[in-house]
């Protein structure tokens, strides 16, 4: 079947794992708690369902008369089309045509299926597994019994995933977009930190200024970033106020060329306070960011944007994205090398 038209500059993103929904969203989509649920990734219209013990992602288009399978139902271990009842197995092959039960099923009666897994309470999809060198992004709190983990409701922005990533990792905007909320406006000059590439991740550390007048919910402390390319950010905060660990895991789904569905999971060591205080604080911070990031135009960063030394993180990020785009054109080995070859600036050891 045909592939959705996407910008050639973003074709390489098909090789990465992206979250498309929470498990809760899928369970709420149908009384069975199994789906199906319509989702969109890189302009591909997809359907997600749980068939037996397996989470499955397919193109959301029946091979028969092109009805959306996401309007259908789960029948046993199969996904049933709402129009004529054709049933598809976990591999996307049609196993039942009710109108012709005694006739051979045509060989073309199948739909494209894609890699699909559940991790951290999110459903992840990889559209192209041919290079097979990417993994679901790293979330440091996933298996830490000390931490309470909360999955927030996804939030949508009219912005690219690249712009969202840059916003989340931008040190010099704190004093201007988040004065009194997340940062002290008198601390407008951030340090220039060494950045390492290792195992398909950016890793860097930023020690925020101490004794800033911010709310207790503000995760201020030593920031340790582990950012799995291209759009995931794992931020571990060793909080100054309580000497405890707070983790933010933010990852953006590139829905199409201008829309981003964002997922935030947070975890904290001290959990005697209400989850809702932290959820409300995160929502407040994002509400401060959103209108500014959505105002950026064009949506994709143009080459004539002026950068300064304080923009090191976004400069290095854009450089790596360009390298991945070019390597993708050369094939699997070049892409693997561009993604996984280490580039170390700091004195940290990764052995």
UniProtKB/Swiss-Prot annotation:
PROSITE patterns: RIESKE. Its EC number is 1.14.13.178. [2Fe-2S] cluster binds at residues 62, 64, 81, 84. This is Methylxanthine N1-demethylase NdmA. Pfam families: Rieske (PF00355), VanA_C (PF19112). One of its GO terms (biological process) is alkaloid catabolic process. Optimum pH is 7.5.
């Amino acid at each position: 079947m045909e592939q959705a038209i996407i910008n050639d500059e973003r074709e390489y993103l098909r090789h990465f794992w992206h979250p498309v929904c929470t498990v809760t969203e899928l369970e709420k989509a149908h009384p069975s708690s199994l789906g199906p649920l319509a989702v969109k990734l890189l302009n591909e219209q997809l359907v997600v369902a749980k068939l037996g013990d397996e989470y499955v992602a397919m193109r959301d288009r029946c091979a028969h008369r092109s009805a959306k399978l996401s309007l259908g139902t789960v029948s046993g271990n199969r996904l049933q089309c709402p129009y004529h009842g054709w049933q598809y197995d976990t591999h996307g092959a049609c196993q039942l045509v009710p109108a012709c039960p005694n006739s051979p099923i045509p060989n073309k009666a199948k739909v494209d299926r894609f890699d699909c897994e559940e991790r951290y309470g999110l459903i992840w999809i990889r559209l192209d597994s041919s290079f097979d060198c990417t993994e679901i992004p790293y979330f440091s709190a996933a298996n830490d019994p000390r931490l309470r983990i909360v999955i927030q409701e996804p939030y949508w922005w009219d912005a690219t995933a690249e712009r969202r990533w840059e916003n989340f990792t931008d040190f010099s905007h704190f004093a201007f977009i988040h004065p009194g909320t997340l940062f002290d406006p008198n601390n407008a000059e951030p340090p220039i930190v060494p950045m390492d590439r290792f195992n398909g991740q950016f890793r860097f550390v930023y020690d925020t200024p101490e004794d800033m007048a911010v709310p207790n919910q503000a995760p201020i402390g030593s920031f340790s970033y582990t950012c799995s390319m291209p759009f995931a950010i794992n931020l571990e905060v060793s909080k100054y106020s309580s000497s405890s660990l707070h983790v933010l895991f933010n990852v953006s789904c590139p829905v199409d060329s201008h829309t981003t569905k964002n997922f935030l999971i947070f975890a904290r060591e001290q959990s005697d306070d209400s989850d809702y205080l932290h959820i409300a604080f995160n929502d407040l911070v994002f509400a401060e960011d959103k209108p500014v990031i959505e105002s950026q135009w064009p949506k994709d960063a143009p080459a004539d944007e002026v950068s300064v030394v304080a923009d090191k993180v976004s400069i290095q990020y854009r450089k790596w994205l360009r390298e991945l785009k070019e390597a993708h054109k050369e094939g699997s080995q070049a892409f693997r090398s561009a993604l996984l070859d280490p580039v170390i600036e700091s004195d940290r050891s990764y052995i």
